[in-house]
A protein has these predicted regions:
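N-terminal amphipathic alpha-helix/helix-capping segment at the start of soluble metabolic enzymes
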Residues: 1-39, 49, 83-104, 112
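Alpha/beta enzyme core
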Residues: 47-71, 76-78, 112-208
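Glycine-rich nucleotide/cofactor/substrate-binding loop typically near the N-terminus or early
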Residues: 107
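Structural motif
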Residues: 37-41, 67-68
Length: 208
């Protein structure tokens, strides 16, 4: 099957694409793919329209759902569907590639977020079980990363990548890396990701 650039894909194209096809479509877009992260737990900006749909209307190519619990998914303003259909409903409404974040966090460090928006839940942990459930729900991309204060180290990302790659690496695109230190001393600034970390991520199974 001929693969288009992601920039040229229709929703029906994306629905038919495999993981390999999606990676080729992204690569073919030469760095011009736009991803946007949204949080379904927070109130929608447009009240009765999901933030994912709003982001799609602003030309996002990949929707990344942060704080998405695969065991108890919540997307405010999404029409009522069975929990296992949550991701497929977002894809139906937006026609976009949909990914989620999973976090290989340090349980002790994550306790600092108890009582806050960032409080960890079992359905957000970077485990093979959660990744398999996400794949079954229709997720196209899993990003192994960390929210503020959850104690996600690059070493933990590598270890979870190995397990998740073995479980769903043939079905789902896997990405790895952090935008901030996630509460890990020594992994801020230039140390957020080093060339050695990038190599370790690739060896462990990261596609992106």
């Amino acid at each position: 099957m001929s693969v288009k650039r992601l920039l040229d894909c229709t929703p029906s194209d994306l629905a038919a694409y495999s993981k390999t096809d999606l990676l080729a479509a992204i690569a073919g877009s030469e760095g011009r793919v736009l991803a946007c992260e949204t949080i379904g737990l927070t109130p929608p900006l447009l009240v009765d329209v999901t933030n994912a749909e709003y982001a799609a209307s602003l030309s996002t190519d990949i929707l990344l759902l942060n704080m998405f619990d695969v065991q108890h998914p919540v997307i405010n303003a999404l029409p009522k569907v069975p929990e296992e259909e949550t991701v497929r409903e977002i894809k139906r409404l937006t026609g976009r590639v949909v990914g989620i974040n999973l976090e290989p966090c340090d349980p002790q460090a994550a306790k600092s977020n108890d009582g806050t928006l960032w409080k960890m839940s079992s359905g957000r942990l970077a485990t093979a079980e959660n990744a398999s459930r996400a794949a079954d729900m229709g997720v196209d991309l899993i990003v192994l990363t960390g929210n503020p204060g959850n104690g996600v180290s690059n070493e933990l990302i590598v270890e979870s990548l190995k397990d998740i790659s073995a479980a769903v690496g043939d079905r789902v695109m896997l990405a790895a890396g952090k935008m901030h230190a996630s509460g890990v001393a020594g992994e801020g600034g230039e140390q957020i990701m080093t060339p050695a970390d990038a190599e370790a991520f690739m060896v462990a199974g990261a596609d992106i």
